[in-house]
Amino acid sequence: MAEKFIKHTGLVVPLDAANVDTDAIIPKQFLQKVTRTGFGAHLFNDWRFLDEKGQQPNPDFVLNFPQYQGASILLARENFGCGSSREHAPWALTDYGFKVVIAPSFADIFYGNSFNNQLLPVKLSDAEVDELFALVKANPGIHFDVDLEAQEVKAGEKTYRFTIDAFRRHCMMNGLDSIGLTLQHDDAIASYEEKQPAFMR
């Protein structure tokens, strides 16, 4: 069972870029592994580092700024997670420590993969995201409160409403991935299997 997501308060880092694709999130040369851990070290590798091996941090990239170390909420622009459908993208984000991504829109496959990996993608309007970028710029180190149960983001003096469909919300709040959903019906599955003829088992 995955970790439950009900509420999260975290430091916000502003990635002021639209159309951030999955190859930028986790470059293809790091996709050999099939476990979900270890990808955070290579998150935004080509932007975070000046060398291919990831040894020399790029001082001009926002994730490397001292005031954003330990950030767990990523603020981005429209069409976040576009490109190929690699599930490694949310793996890299969560392994780095992100719990929430806020943007005006997400690529459909990335959006679905995020829920499967307990990464909450929050859609707000362009105008609301503009407000949040301005707020973070004026208040480096600001924390947002994200409440999945109430479907609200509290930022400064304002509260922003977002909508997550009921099924995905239920899964995240109960820490259920695809396997967890199946295991909810473990007794019913076992009962069904016991009723099958021996040659079908």
Curated annotation (Swiss-Prot):
Keyword Amino-acid biosynthesis in record: yes
CDD domains named among the record's database cross-references: IPMI_Swivel
Keyword Amino-acid biosynthesis: yes
GO molecular function: 3-isopropylmalate dehydratase activity
Superkingdom assignment: Bacteria
A Pfam family recorded for this sequence: Aconitase_C
A Gene Ontology BP annotation from the UniProt entry: L-leucine biosynthetic process
Entry keyword set: Amino-acid biosynthesis, Branched-chain amino acid biosynthesis, Leucine biosynthesis, Lyase
EC number(s) recorded for this UniProt protein: 4.2.1.33
Family annotation (SUPFAM superfamilies): LeuD/IlvD-like
Pathway: Amino-acid biosynthesis; L-leucine biosynthesis; L-leucine from 3-methyl-2-oxobutanoate: step 2/4
UniProt GO cellular component terms: 3-isopropylmalate dehydratase complex
Catalytic activity: (2R,3S)-3-isopropylmalate = (2S)-2-isopropylmalate
UniProt xrefs under NCBIfam families: leuD, PRK01641.1
Subunit organization: Heterodimer of LeuC and LeuD.
Similarity field: Belongs to the LeuD family. LeuD type 1 subfamily.
Functional description taken from the UniProt entry: Catalyzes the isomerization between 2-isopropylmalate and 3-isopropylmalate, via the formation of 2-isopropylmaleate.
Protein name (record): 3-isopropylmalate dehydratase small subunit
